[in-house]
Amino acid sequence: MKKKIAEYEVGEQVDLFLLIKTATKGIASNGKPFLTVILQDQSGDIEAKLWDVSPEVERQYTAETIVKVAGDIQNYKGRIQLRVKQIRVANPNEVTDISDFVEKAPVKKEDMVEKITQYIFEMRNPNIQRLTRHLLNKHQNDFLDYPAATKNHHEFVSGLAYHVVSMLDLAKAISTLYPSLDKDLLYAGVILHDLGKVIELSGPISTTYTLEGNLLGHISIMVNEIGKAAEELKIEGEEVLILQHIVLSHHGKAEWGSPKPPLVKEAEILHYIDNLDAKMNMMDRALGRTKPGEYTERVFALDNRSFYKPKFQTYYDK
């Protein structure tokens, strides 16, 4: 069985069909145009450069194009890259299904729906429960398909739902340790905090930002969605405002994208849970591609650090 792109090591030769996830134009120091392409299959993705490209080449190698690539894996300033020697657009008879090249969450959609539904069922506050169920039902199909981001963490098919399920399990464990937390608020905040991304982002494959995503962002989108849902369901009360605040503040600081800092206990905890799960996902995936006794490639979103994988640990190999 042929290896996937994430399984190749530095120095190895590559000859694979891959999907162009993104293609970004740049200008080199010599004034000539180049493309930075992110190539992916079900195992993950890798960056590559196409140098001295013509307008025709730019039109050929766009997002969602399947290509045949030959080259070798190299480490450039702590980042793993594919040095391209040959590349061409795949013929229709060579590959047929774009989903064969897309990374997916490791848990089935139906299992994630069942778990999230159970958490909603456990809510005792009827206003919080009705709002949460209404909004999830409204966006459920996209919620189960979309990634949680365009890059850095959970940026794969069903990544958004997988992120939420992990956060719900964290929220439950923390609530057991700190019983003064309002579980209804915390669970609802987890489920709703990133739900606006189904409007902010374009879809599960070659994900980009929509017009609404660029102009409003997922936080503002979901605050408005909560308000509209409350009107439709004729729900009045402080729960609506607090849920809006939890969504509004979940990034923690203005410089991280939240207009207000967390001013409710559950909002503060949600911010930490969100941050923890995102960082664990980034570290686990980087370490999963690393041999014991070696460092990961640099993880840009974690201060561009490389993480060491101790020789005595076998967790990531299981």
Curated annotation (Swiss-Prot):
GO terms for biological process: rRNA 3'-end processing. The keyword Hydrolase applies. Pfam families: HD, tRNA_anti-codon. InterPro entries: 3'-5'_exoribonuclease_YhaM, HD/PDEase_dom, HD_domain, NA-bd_OB-fold, NA-bd_OB_tRNA, YhaM_exoribonuc/phosphodiest. Residues 163-279 form the HD domain. Keywords: Exonuclease, Hydrolase, Nuclease. One of its GO terms (molecular function) is nucleic acid binding. It is an enzyme of class 3 (hydrolase). Its EC number is 3.1.-.-. The keyword Nuclease applies. Belongs to the YhaM family. Shows a 3'-5' exoribonuclease activity. HAMAP family: 3_5_Exoribonuc_YhaM. This is 3'-5' exoribonuclease YhaM. It comes from Bacillus cytotoxicus (strain DSM 22905 / CIP 110041 / 391-98 / NVH 391-98). The gene is yhaM.
